[in-house]
Amino acid sequence: TFSEKPAETQKSLGITLWSDNFDNPGNWTIDNSGQSGIEYGWNINNVSDGWYSANGINSTGGGNYAELVNGDPTQTPGTQALAVTYTLTTANPIDISALGGTNHVSLSFEQYGARFNDLQEIQISYDGVTFVTVGDNLDKSVLSASGGSAYSNPDVKSINLATTLPANP
């Protein structure tokens, strides 16, 4: 199979180094922890497949989006899988060393959803084996029967990586 590698080029500060709008699912590697079916784990398409929102994200990227689904807790009994880790990783490394020796890098993305007692982590890796958590969803309140709310649609998450990256990556 052919997988198009996203273009990576040197950029000035304040310029996008890499972006993706999920139009090519081959840019991503999905590990759904042995779960199968559209109702478990990550999927990339233009359809909202989850139980919570039929509308999906109001993304400025248009087209496809990546969506994480874990069963349906509103059914009796609930169908969500327990003790699983779902991962979505870029298929090819994003070479930030192309910035010319600076660690002034931010990771920004749009998201929509809610925190249902689950932890969402954003991780980076220098070697593709060891990952470091650089962000999570603990800044969001839990949405439960006793209160809380979904994220804004879309919610823009921006993570400054300068504190994580070496001075000259």
Feature-to-residue mapping (PLM):
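Extended extracellular/luminal ectodomain segments enriched in beta-structured repeat modules
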Residues: 83-85, 94-108, 117, 167-169
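Extracellular carbohydrate recognition and processing domains
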Residues: 131-166
